[in-house]
């Protein structure tokens, strides 16, 4: 345990970080010289997250590290406290807003290769949200791709998914079950328009994730010809500004907070994050109709359990067919599966597709527990 006084604690933390840095330096040296006890994998699991020894960098690290390769700006992938960040240039505004203006960020365009130590790295569109990327890593002619979160469906709010051939694929599996098959964004936007305009006597509150889903809804509504102003919760507005700066075509919008408190909101469509549902913020809306837009609305009973009147199935992740198509088209001889239904999907790939696949948990684990780092 660290000392109780602040000076001693700072020294203890500093020593621990230096110790960790020394361990990572040894890992890189082992990769460069081949001095390890076993052949090194191009990517390994560590307590800090996925680690590429040849680059001496981590992908979407779980803990602060010297070098972080970021797939996209969602909070479960981009965390504060890292020494340097590499990410797609179109994600820069949101990353700095969420992680701090002062972060050291190397903003890269899609497709441009750069070198970190012994690895050649490039970012390729994942089609998930603005600035989302798959990460391609090449070492000595061997290519691995980490998809991060991705989808294969058309989405007017971000760059489309790019297929990246590879030897080894690490794919997400959030919706890796046959029940998950998405309609087009246009079809869902039409359902939403009809729901909203079918009851002009009440406000229509549509709950959705504030980064990615909300902006996609605005873009999908614009694509089907909706030009009536949509009102936004503050958390949605903050992110939407970055999409407008990126010239994403979306239906007009403004923050609810800009309207006079006594103005009637009957007949208006309002986008808000799930955290606002049943909160004090909702007191402003008289007898609203409510709905939630998410891939999870495909699960029977999910809408009712969450307390919404209506559910719209719209996801920014690949559905069952999209996942299968990606694995097949990648040409990968080895597939690791992470997030969601990793056991189910990897087993299906082995037994039905004849593909060498297993959960990411089976990937080489370079485990260095904190107890071994105690000073």
Task: Please tell me what each predicted stretch does.
Residues 12, 18, 27-35, 162-163, ...:
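Binuclear metal-ion centers of metallo-dependent hydrolases, dominated by the metallo-beta-lactamase
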Residues 37-54, 58-63, 67, 73-212, ...:
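His/Asp/Glu-rich metal-coordinating catalytic cores
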Residues 84-92, 170, 228-239, 292:
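Short internal beta-strands
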Residues 20-31, 256-375:
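C-terminal regulatory/interaction regions
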Residues 127-139, 150, 154-155, 161, ...:
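Active-site-proximal loop/helix segment associated with metal-binding centers of metalloenzymes
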Residues 42-58, 245-268, 272-282:
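A short, well-structured beta->alpha microelement
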Residues 78, 132, 154-155, 214-218, ...:
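Short, well-ordered alpha-helical microsegments
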């Amino acid at each position: 345990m660290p000392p109780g006084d602040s000076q001693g604690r700072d020294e203890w933390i500093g020593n621990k970080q230096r110790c960790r840095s020394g361990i990572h330096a040894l890992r890189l040296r082992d990769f460069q010289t081949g001095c390890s006890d076993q052949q090194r994998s191009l990517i390994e699991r560590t307590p800090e997250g996925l680690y590429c020894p040849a680059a001496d960098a981590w992908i979407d690290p779980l803990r602060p590290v010297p070098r972080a390769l970021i797939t996209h700006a969602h909070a479960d992938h981009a965390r504060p406290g890292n020494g340097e960040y590499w990410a797609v240039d179109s994600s820069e505004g949101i990353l700095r807003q969420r992680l701090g203006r002062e972060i050291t960020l190397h903003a890269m365009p899609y497709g441009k290769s750069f070198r970190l130590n012994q690895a050649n790295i490039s970012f390729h569109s994942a089609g998930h949200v603005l600035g989302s990327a798959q990460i391609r890593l090449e070492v000595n002619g061997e290519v691995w791709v980490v998809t991060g979160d991705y989808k294969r469906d058309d989405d007017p709010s971000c760059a489309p998914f790019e297929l990246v051939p590879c030897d080894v694929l690490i794919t997400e599996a959030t919706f890796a079950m046959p029940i998950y098959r998405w309609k087009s964004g246009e079809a869902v936007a039409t359902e939403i328009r009809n729901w909203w305009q079918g009851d002009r006597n009440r406000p229509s509150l549509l709950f959705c994730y504030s980064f990615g889903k909300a902006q996609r809804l605005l873009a999908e509504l614009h694509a089907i010809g909706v030009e009536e102003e949509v009102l936004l919760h503050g958390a949605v507005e903050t992110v939407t500004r970055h999409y407008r700066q990126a010239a994403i075509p979306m239906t007009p919008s403004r923050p609810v907070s800009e309207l006079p408190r006594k103005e009637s909101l009957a007949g208006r469509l309002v986008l808000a994050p799930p955290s606002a549902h049943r909160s004090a913020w909702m007191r402003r809306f008289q007898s609203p109709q409510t709905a939630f837009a998410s891939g999870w609305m495909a699960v029977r009973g999910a809408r009712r359990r969450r307390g919404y009147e209506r559910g719209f199935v719209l996801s920014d992740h690949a559905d069952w067919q999209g996942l299968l198509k990606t694995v097949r088209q990648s040409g990968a001889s080895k597939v690791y599966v992470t997030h969601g239904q990793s056991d189910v999907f990897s087993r299906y790939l082995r037994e039905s597709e004849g593909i060498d696949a297993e959960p990411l948990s089976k990937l080489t684990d370079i485990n260095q527990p904190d107890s071994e780092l105690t000073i």
